[in-house]
Amino acid sequence: MARMHRRFSTPTIFSATFLAISTALLVFMVAVIAGLVLYPSLPQLIASLTSAEILFAIQLSLITSAISTALCIIIAVPVAYAMTRFSFPGKSLANVVVNLPLSLPPLVAGVALLIFFGPSLVGTVLRASGIDIVYTVTAIVVAQFFVNVPYMIRITRSAFETINPRYEHVARTLGCSDWGAFRQVTLPLATQGLVAGLVITWSKSIGEFGAVLLLAGATTMKTETLPIAVYLNISTGELNEAIAASVILIGIALVSLLVFERYGDGTRIL
């Protein structure tokens, strides 16, 4: 028995090779991120983090991402539930369409949104009604929502798929309506998945760049979210401000992933 234990615990060339590749990748990623964070001196980083431009970008990013994430979860919950529990004509096609933004480069999504709210019939009617979307703060929310709602739908759907439909059936036999069974049984059981999806969607909304750039533009202190701040400051050679915005985005991504690992057990992003 001891001999068998030693045989299984002794590293082989196979396992050593795979572990070496994994370690090399980990070291590379840590070195890249650490190099960015440690590049400016601490006083320079603090000064950049507290500059009026970066503070504006933080505030705008938090507000727009909160709104777009709220919209995502409001839409994603019923859509994900319908895709999980109901059968209807064209369900496969609907699934493809809902997930299409996941396969599109964000810049392509931005172009599509720009045309839709710009020269198209919809955009013309909206402008005639006094509603202008393009190059406004509203455009940031719209772009974040369009790109990220498929992620929320997929994560929420994954959470619903782990729940046995029998629980809802039992609740109905005990007198619950469909809505009551959903609210009292399904939603509580899906809470962890919903929290994980909310956090990841919020993080991705804050980090959205391509679609936001094309639909909302890149105007300093107007439509300047954190990713736009990185873009603008790199373009003008203000490296410290770009790094400051990047550090904030890295921190948000790190916290979001930790929360997802905590609450997203068994939940898929893609």
What feature does the model see in each segment?
Residues 2, 263-270:
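Short, charged juxtamembrane terminal tails flanking transmembrane helices
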Residues 9-42, 52-161, 185, 189-210, ...:
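Membrane-water interface segments at the C-terminal ends of transmembrane alpha-helices
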Residues 89, 176-178:
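Short coil/turn motifs that cap or connect alpha-helices
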Residues 167:
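Helix-turn-helix DNA-binding elements, focusing on the entry/boundary residues of the two helices
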Residues 171:
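The alpha-helix within a helix-turn-helix
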Residues 174-175, 188:
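Glycine/proline-centered hinge or cleavage motifs at structural transition points of membrane proteins
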Residues 211-237:
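Glycine-rich helix-loop "coupling/hinge" segments at transmembrane-helix boundaries
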